[in-house]
Regions:
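N-terminal helix-turn-helix DNA-binding module of bacterial transcription factors
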Residues: 1-62, 339
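Alpha-helical recognition/docking segments in bacterial nutrient-uptake
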Residues: 1-2, 60-177
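Short beta-strand segments enriched in small/hydrophobic residues
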Residues: 13, 18-23, 57-73, 123, ...
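Hinge/beta->alpha junction and helix N-cap segments in small-molecule ligand-binding domains
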Residues: 70-79, 97-106, 128, 154, ...
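Short helix-capping segments at alpha-helix termini
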Residues: 90-91, 209-217, 243-246, 268-273
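Short acidic capping loops at alpha-helix termini that bridge into adjacent secondary structure
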Residues: 185-186, 216-220, 273-278
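Flexible loop/turn connectors
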Residues: 238-340
Length: 340
């Protein structure tokens, strides 16, 4: 039994937080005597042997954090990895990066590899790690029984899993609603992912229509299945919608590269931006400044999220009780592609 016990099991049986168990193991004075006795009794009963994480920042800590990223060629994910790695280094932690791809089995294998390296924690970058099927997420829950798992821009309710995310639903809703209130009804929503974040953004677009007593037309919700590098493919995709008779006065997108492709479509059809067509991107990446006119985009506070994630990680490892979910609000950065 003792070999199977984890700090999570101890906290559950004692009815206290993981951070409290860690403080007991570290001999912290900031624990009530009654609570300390309860935790120690359970530890003695099961012969629990704490690892480096359970003791917090102990001598056996590897001072190494694993980072999982599906695709390092993606601008958003690459920038997130940069911010996280930089903040870890500033806190005297090393990092090990695994680029997993998008297949679940590959993600599982990469996580298993990091666990075998005895990292102190694992950061999962991006919402694509959380799937709709609960069974597909079980490997994350299992890993969290031994080390804290940090999710960036994803939400998963499980013990020892900490989520730092942007309210993509509200950000997309607000962006869409700004166009509706300016008098535009025919708004194309262009997206490229059905991930957790992707679904929240789509729901935000739909909610903006419902909140203004307008019908949601599925024809105006279009998913581009191509690569995030295929901007020409985006242009051709929007062109086909136009050629098939779909008319729109604005385009809200889930990613900046989609907005760039939409801009190229407008120019090819001599549609003036923003007079004839208004365009909104998402992520406020460098791509917004590489387009003419420059693109209005939602800033999802990526750097702030990464700083908070590392702060939560360091606090958790040191035995401090940290919030399991931190949510940031997006901000619409208005530029030349809109008139709202």
């Amino acid at each position: 039994m003792s070999n199977q016990m984890t700090i999570y099991d101890i906290s559950k049986k004692a009815g206290v937080s993981i951070a409290t168990v860690s403080r007991v193991l570290n001999g912290s004075s900031n624990v009530k005597p009654k609570t300390r006795k309860k935790v120690m009794d359970i530890i003695d009963q099961y012969g629990y042997k704490p690892n480096a994480f359970a003791r917090g920042l102990g001598l056996n800590s590897m001072k190494t954090i694993g980072i999982l990223c599906a695709d390092s060629s993606d601008l958003y994910l690459a920038k997130a990895v940069y911010f996280i790695e930089r903040n870890l280094r500033e806190n005297e932690y090393n990092s090990v990066l695994c680029c997993t791809g998008y297949e679940v089995e590959d993600k599982k294998e990469s996580l298993k590899l990091l666990l075998s390296q005895h990292v102190d924690s694992v950061v999962m970058v991006g919402s694509n790690f959380i799937l709709n099927d609960a069974e597909e997420n079980q490997y994350i829950k299992d890993a969290a029984e031994s080390i804290p798992i940090m999710l960036l821009n994803a939400d998963y309710d499980a013990p020892n899993v900490y989520c730092t995310l942007c309210d993509d639903f509200k950000a997309t809703q607000d962006a869409t609603e700004a166009l509706i209130k300016s008098g535009i009804d025919d708004i194309l929503y262009l997206y490229n992912s059905r991930s957790y974040s992707g679904q929240k953004k789509l729901a935000g677009y739909q909610s903006a229509y419902l909140a203004n007593d307008k019908l949601v037309n599925k024809d105006y919700q279009q998913c581009f299945e191509g690569s995030h590098e295929d901007i020409e493919g985006v242009t051709a995709f929007v062109q086909k919608l136009w050629d098939d008779g779909l008319r729109f006065k604005a385009i809200v997108t889930s990613e900046d590269f989609l907005a760039v492709g939409a801009t190229k479509f407008a120019k090819a059809n001599k549609l003036s931006i923003p007079k004839d067509l208004q365009i909104i991107g998402y992520n406020d990446s460098v791509l917004t400044l590489c387009s003419e006119p420059s693109l209005t985009s939602v800033n999802n506070r990526l750097e702030d999220m990464c700083i908070q994630l590392v702060k939560t990680l360091i606090g958790t490892l040191s035995g401090t009780e940290m919030p399991q979910k931190t949510i940031f609000s997006g901000e619409l950065i208005k530029r030349g592609s809109t008139d709202i």
